[in-house]
Regions:
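Peripheral, non-transmembrane regulatory/ligand-interaction domains of membrane transport proteins
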Residues: 1-192
Length: 192
């Protein structure tokens, strides 16, 4: 509720994992006075990465990406963050906890997150997602190396050609997700 927010000491972080309970999302959105258009974007999980400024905070949409190695497909989970004066509300599309290690650090009092404001927590959450992109790039590199080895041993096998096209599609999908994020992150750093 707004009263809880105003009377709370320190930083409040509400993390919603899974977007299936729309009533809960609406309740939290109303309690933290999150703009209705931002809440609509939370529930519409096909948003491009973006940063929007509202009177009472910043709204960030980004994507947690991972590689489905078996099918050579890029899997995307939308993450939305709303950072206000003394609070951050994060919305994770999937029930898996993308921010588990950040939560552990805050609960154990490690690092600066609890001592800093909502902007620092939002930065840490965004940084966590971006760090995952390096893992994704390592996985893509591994696939390229395996593909090179496959080409040397099997020649121009049809399965090898199919994997080349699959990998090219993954790289293009990654680039498509990365470009809007670059712009949003640049705007985020300028608002600090």
């Amino acid at each position: 509720t707004p009263e809880l927010r105003q009377n709370a000491e320190g930083l409040i972080w509400v993390d919603i994992r899974s977007l299936t309970d729309t009533k809960l999302i609406e309740l939290v959105g109303n309690g933290f006075q999150i703009h209705p258009l931002a809440l609509e974007d939370v529930l519409n999980t096909h948003q491009r990465s973006k940063l929007e400024e509202y009177d009472n905070g910043l709204f960030f949409v980004l994507h947690n990406l991972r590689l489905d190695v078996e099918n050579l497909d890029l899997v995307s989970e939308q993450i939305a963050l709303f950072a206000g004066n003394n609070f951050v509300v994060s919305f994770q599309e999937d029930p898996d906890d993308t921010f588990a290690h950040i939560r552990k650090r805050t609960q154990e009092g490690l690092g600066r997150i609890r001592k800093k404001g909502s902007d620092y927590l939002a930065y840490a959450l965004v940084d966590n997602i971006v760090d995952g992109y390096y893992i994704l790039l390592d996985e893509i590199e591994t696939q390229v190396l395996e593909l090179e080895e496959m080409m040397y041993t099997n020649g121009s096998d049809p399965a090898c050609k199919a994997r080349i096209f699959d990998l090219k599609r993954v790289v293009n999908q990654f680039r498509h997700r990365l470009l809007p994020l670059r712009d949003a992150v640049a705007r985020f750093y300028r608002t600090e």
